[in-house]
Amino acid sequence: MSKEHGQKILRKDNIPYLLSWVLLIFAYTLTIFFISRKITCFLDADMSSELLLAKILSGSNGIITTRWDYSSEIRILYIQIITSFLFRFIKSWHTVRVLSTAIHIAIMLFSYYCLCRSLKIERAFPLTASILALPISYEYITYYLMGMYYLPFITVMFFFLALFFDYCGRDGKRDKKKTAGEITAYVIAFLSGLGGYRMILLFFFPLFLILFFPVMRDLLKGGEDKGHLRRFRFGVIFFISVLCGLILYVFVLSKVFTVQQFDHFFFMPFDSSVLDFNINAFIDNLGYTTGPLMFSGIMKNIGFGAVICLAAFSLFNIPKKEEREESRILTYLFICSVCLFTLVQLFIVRDTVERYISPVVILLVPVCTNNICKAEYKRKRIIAAASVVLVFLKLAGEVTFYRDYKDLDFTGPYREVALYLQENDIGYGYSTFWNGNIITELTDGEVEMYHWESPESMDVSDPSSLRDWLQEKSHLEAFPEGKIAVILGEEELPFTSLAHALEQKEPDLVSDYLYVYVFESNDALVNSSAEYDLDYFYDGTYLVDGYDEDGVRYLYEQGYSYGPMIDLPGGSYRLTITGDGLDDISFMPTAGKGAYVSDAMEVSRDNNTAVYEFCFEYYSDDVEFVIINEGNGTVRLDSVALVKTA
């Protein structure tokens, strides 16, 4: 290195730039270190489902598969591309998760660098990228940095905008590099459309509108702007591309692959509570935190205030020069995305959560960076210095998330259960979704979990009752052979359809709120669930016009007997009555205060035995079996036996 070159690097205005790179490296390293040490404590079923899908894809050499029941989207440009590749060489699921997270965050930061370079503000990249490398909000750290659910969405937005602004900056000149970039943008749009509606609503449709309105304005004024027309041409092609991807998704992919259909779109009346929810969701995504006036909360909300100041200045100081058209496009894109998302939530879809708006909120980072760097004002150094101070305040607030999270542990009981299953060579488990795939990840795939939508729907005699959501399709075809563990939370036990079977044995493991019951096979569990030891004759007050004698119940003419007020899950049942004079009886099941529940079909009946079948569609409380003597003589009831048949 020459002396002159070295002096240039150490030039006064380069020192802050170099320090900003040090800050970015520190922020990125801190995040990856935190994730490597603590991610196991924050796992949930959704996170583990994504890793399980990647493991399946690693053996099929593809990016999508028919072996999987997808949730609401078939995500093409998603984390499985890299994560499944890592599974080919690494057995530890934890190592795969940490490496995949590190790679995807690095790719997201690189996409942001590409955007900054296309906007010609790359010197601001390291400082503002540090914001993206640290927890902006609870939603961002949970669903982006740790969960990675929507991290690819941000990456796609940044890459696409970088390609778009490169296209805008070439002034109609064509070369191979620029043409390749333009084609790449159209391919990204098409692949994004293959993933469903989300990216279209959040990003592509708002961007198309931003490019469409200037052309319409020129048309109405009778003028023509070549720049507007060229950008609109780009918008038309990319929007056609994304629509082609969506059409292929709706009419082909959603038919070939199992995925939840969006069949709940309706026009709805205005509801101010929905508007309140979305405003609060937006604020939360900016980092606002409720709670006591403690150090971490104060720092987070100071950071939130800093973001508000930066956003307000940026949105009200859009560069006005003609060559700064990209500033207006980027700013209006953010505003249009927020407005469109809010309108959809108000009048069409309301099953939303705070994290759905996060990708739109993240657009504020390039918007603020670009507008502050390019806005025309006299005291530029003062504004720049103030902006840097505000950024540091936000960074200080972001770091406190790690301070708050360092002692939290949400998966301790799951880790204990996972260790128990491994030590006892139990390869399969039954649970609801939220207690399912997380066990598979914690055992490095050694325990295969079958999960249902709710504890009430756990029908172990019918595999099709399993939820077709984020698990292998083969699960819905047959139950496994070998030892199985039923894993349920304390709040689920009273409502599970397996309650009868579980009440007959002590739990094999209790880990905080998780209960584990081990059975030698699925058949053993089915048999335990099927046979009910009814105490039908437990109380004489449930006998009208009759009497008890030595454990036998007698009914006079028009007398009736009922009991035992038990809870039964939905399903089919067979009731067998033994005694004398049963030719003259009738039978009816009821629930709660004699409420009619189900017709009973007579299978067979003679003087000594009567067999009936009936079913409950749903879980039923306080079920009673009413037996009525319809004859003229006395009826003797010796026993009443109940078996669940399906």
Predicted regions mapped to residue ranges:
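Short periplasmic/luminal acceptor-recognition loop of GT-C membrane glycosyltransferases, typified by
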Residues: 423-458
